Amino acid sequence: MQPRIRLLQRRAVHFLVLIGWQAGVCRKEALMEYEGRICRGPMEAKAFMLPVTVGCPYNRCKFCDLFTDLKYRKISMEDIENELKRVSALGGNPSLIYLGDGNAFQLSTDELMEIIALVKRYFSNAHSFNSDATITSIKSKSDEELKTLHSLGYNKLYIGIENALPDVLNYMDKDHSVDEAYSEIKRLQDAGFSYAAHFMTGVAGSGRWEESAVAMAEFLTETKPENVVNFSMFLSADKLSEEIRNGNFKPATELENLKEERKLVELLDVEPAHPIKWDSFHDWIHVRTRGSLPKDKDKILSVLDKAIAKFDKLPDIYSMKMGTPENDDGYGFLGQESPSLKDVYIAPGAV
């Protein structure tokens, strides 16, 4: 039987927003103006998101088209202060601040210090600052700079690790190596920061789910992130789809992605004294696992086992957007009802 490919009419960025809507974390903020789409880790849902940059300064990863329509730039201190004034005048005084956009940590230490000072001037409750970061943005700061930022309340960075196989990172044009990820995260933690790891099942392509899981489990076990979020890879119609059409990349099926996650959770060696908050999305097939490791490990594995058993009986499914063919009704599968796993949707546990 020929594999059925889900054909998506939305941009991949919309997929990320759909993930966020399900988790209650990506939305238009009522009290702020924001270019593009808002996306952040689920655990930052209660934080006030303050835009300090627009887009991504790197913007070359093959798997990502989240920021391709945005030209990276810094938001002026004047505009940042005006936003703080506006929110403060409306009675806002948040304690948790999330600095946006795709890599706010790319700003210089002096710029970040100035922003933190501005926030504290208008929000007396503000005491904790988090943001997205890349390994290269961490590398750009000295040990002393990292310690200084942490002393001012900068506490956690969300880092796109994606995969722990060197050739995969190189092929996908990530701006760091596996060795750099190990060393820079250690420097970050030595300065007092915690970190959250973002990774993507399926990014290594078909047939590599097991070796990807083994490498990622080793990486996460050693680096001890506070949170782990899996945004199972969604194939866009831009850079990566061209590689697929040219035969240079064979995408993993959703079944392979589920097996990769299952193997990773199985292999993770998490100390009870240093638990990991786990959240994983296979949004296009409606599978999500969530919990605290190691406490909820068996529950999460049970959810994945049920999902694997169901999808093992179905034709191959790919989370893929390859244009807008006339015979696609917008729901994928060319008019056929798509399978879901609502009965095994979520593993109970702490978020």
Model regions and ranges:
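Cationic, low-complexity basic patches in intrinsically disordered or flexible, solvent-exposed regions
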Residues: 3, 10, 22
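Short, Lys/Arg-enriched N-terminal segments with co-localized hydrophobic residues
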Residues: 15-31
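Auxiliary Fe-S-binding modules of radical SAM enzymes
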Residues: 27-42, 221-351
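Canonical Radical SAM [4Fe-4S] cluster-binding loop centered on the CxxxCxxC motif
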Residues: 35-82
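Core AdoMet radical
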Residues: 66-83, 87, 91-107, 122-140, ...
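Alpha-helix-loop-beta-strand connector modules within alpha/beta enzyme cores
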Residues: 115-126, 180-196, 254-269
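Conserved strand-turn element in the central/C-terminal portion of the radical SAM core barrel
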Residues: 136, 160, 164-168, 188-212, ...
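Catalytic cores of alpha/beta
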Residues: 145, 206-220
